[in-house]
């Protein structure tokens, strides 16, 4: 042992250095904020800040937020956080690798493990005769680890040469002795259900001890079977671990795609520089900003157009009012002149009064005509400073108390078109009379004035429908719910109607009339029989059940038209 000490000078110094290095390693593995040791996962996983410092995940979550950023607790530099917050910060993988090596017994240059590690990753066993040598064989008789040279030297005699020596890989496991009978090795395993004692037993335990009469198995095959199960389990665990790792990598990739980041690229002359790669989150925000930017521009244009309409209306109204002011001033001047002339005539003598009779008569006739004209003008003109404004769905402005809408009512003969029209107009039931030609009536509802054209539905009149399509904003198609056999005919006429170019932007309101009749088709059945979802695809349409006799459902249909045409109610601007 003295020679060994001489062969290793400065061993104490080396051990001191190793101790100081070990302390330094521990310091590196501690979080500088909470002084807890980092872990491979969980709240103590190390994460990198932009300045290069490493802080555990738990401490990062406790740091105060400054908007979407945090400050380093050591140098106060700012690190921006993405949408994932602290979870989006990169892990310190170099530190994690060092932690993993230390946990697995890898010591590197510091010598923290009890055994050295070879290049193949297997433990190196020292020779029992000379620790400077590496053992390569095992003597099963001497129970010693020997290198090849020491094996030859120590077993050079005839007696010892007979000892069985095997490679270390074939070294047999040492037999475990029974705790109850120390002289006997454990050879069997108890398989008895309900046995409360240790399953390991020797031959004495099996024959005479607590396991007497129990089911049993030989130790080695049982251990090999368990090893095989463990290997299968380990294989499953490795497969499961690979699946988890692959899923985790996908999650990391998705997070990076969402958040974006910096990417190193080379320019045309080979110089590398960082370039920001936008993530899907930033792209989505850009799409939202672009959409609302276009929307703002469109609204601004529509606002300017609406203001120009209002300005033109105000300008025309003021011009007309000022013209009326001038006319009234002239009229007032003429009336005042006539009054003065009459007063002067009254002051004159009788002869002059008689001579002025004709002139006074003409003057009075002129005044009467002017008074009559003034009365007619005053009766027809409403002196109101309000400016009623109505907005359509496409943000166009209409100025006036009522917005006029042109509506065409179509359908087969006998469906109840005229009955619906006069019920809306006069709130009266009108006996069904075939319409020859057309009827036109004005129906005021809320802030709308519907000009409704009721066109006859007889077969010979249907070719004339096209003459009423121009400038039509809404089509009311009336269906007789009580005549199931005419639904296909109504479908054919409606299909032709919807192919007309002049009606492609018109609203379509379908009245399922005569819902009060027993056995009438329901709204759902008519919708299916007319194939409305397919026929009216891409068009604004609505079907409303109604009864023209009682008026049930008629105003609900007008409500739908009002909602489709008008974006806001009438605003009285003083």
Swiss-Prot record:
Disulfide bond positions: none
Top EC class for this record: transferase
A Pfam family reported for this protein in Swiss-Prot or TrEMBL: Arf
Gene Ontology cellular-component annotations: cytoplasm; Golgi membrane; lysosomal membrane; nucleus
Reactions this protein catalyses: S-ubiquitinyl-[E2 ubiquitin-conjugating enzyme]-L-cysteine + [acceptor protein]-L-lysine = [E2 ubiquitin-conjugating enzyme]-L-cysteine + N(6)-ubiquitinyl-[acceptor protein]-L-lysine
Location of the protein in the cell: Cytoplasm; Endomembrane system; Golgi apparatus membrane; Lysosome membrane
UniProt keyword Glycoprotein present: no
Keywords of the record: Coiled coil, Cytoplasm, Golgi apparatus, GTP-binding, Lysosome, Membrane, Metal-binding, Nucleotide-binding, Transferase, Ubl conjugation pathway, Zinc, Zinc-finger
Zinc finger (B box-type): 122-168
Binding site for GTP: 411-418, 454-458, 513-516
Coiled-coil intervals: 352-379
Chain positions covered by the region annotation ARF-like: 390-574
Stored SUPFAM superfamilies: B-box zinc-binding domain (SSF57845), P-loop containing nucleoside triphosphate hydrolases (SSF52540), RING/U-box (SSF57850)
ZnF RING-type: positions: 31-76
Alphabetical list of SMART domains matching this protein: ARF, BBC, BBOX, RAB, RING, SAR
Predominant subcellular localization, coarse grouping: cytoplasm
Pathway in which the depicted protein is active: Protein modification; protein ubiquitination
A GO biological process held by the record: positive regulation of autophagy
CDD domains referenced in this protein's UniProt entry, alphabetically: ARD1 (cd04158), Bbox2_TRIM23_C-IX_rpt1 (cd19773), Bbox2_TRIM23_C-IX_rpt2 (cd19774), mRING-HC-C3HC3D_TRIM23_C-IX (cd16645)
Record family assignment: In the C-terminal section; belongs to the small GTPase superfamily. Arf family.
Swiss-Prot/TrEMBL domain comment: The RING-type zinc finger domain is responsible for E3 ubiquitin ligase activity.
Subunit structure: Homodimer. Interacts with PSCD1. Interacts with UBE2D2. Interacts with TBK1 (via N-terminal kinase domain) and p62/SQSTM1.
NCBIfam families registered for this protein in UniProt: small_GTP (TIGR00231)
Function: Acts as an E3 ubiquitin-protein ligase. Plays an essential role in autophagy activation during viral infection. Mechanistically, activates TANK-binding kinase 1/TBK1 by facilitating its dimerization and ability to phosphorylate the selective autophagy receptor SQSTM1. In order to achieve this function, TRIM23 mediates 'Lys-27'-linked auto-ubiquitination of its ADP-ribosylation factor (ARF) domain to induce its GTPase activity and its recruitment to autophagosomes.
Protein name: E3 ubiquitin-protein ligase TRIM23
Lineage: Eukaryota, Metazoa, Chordata, Craniata, Vertebrata
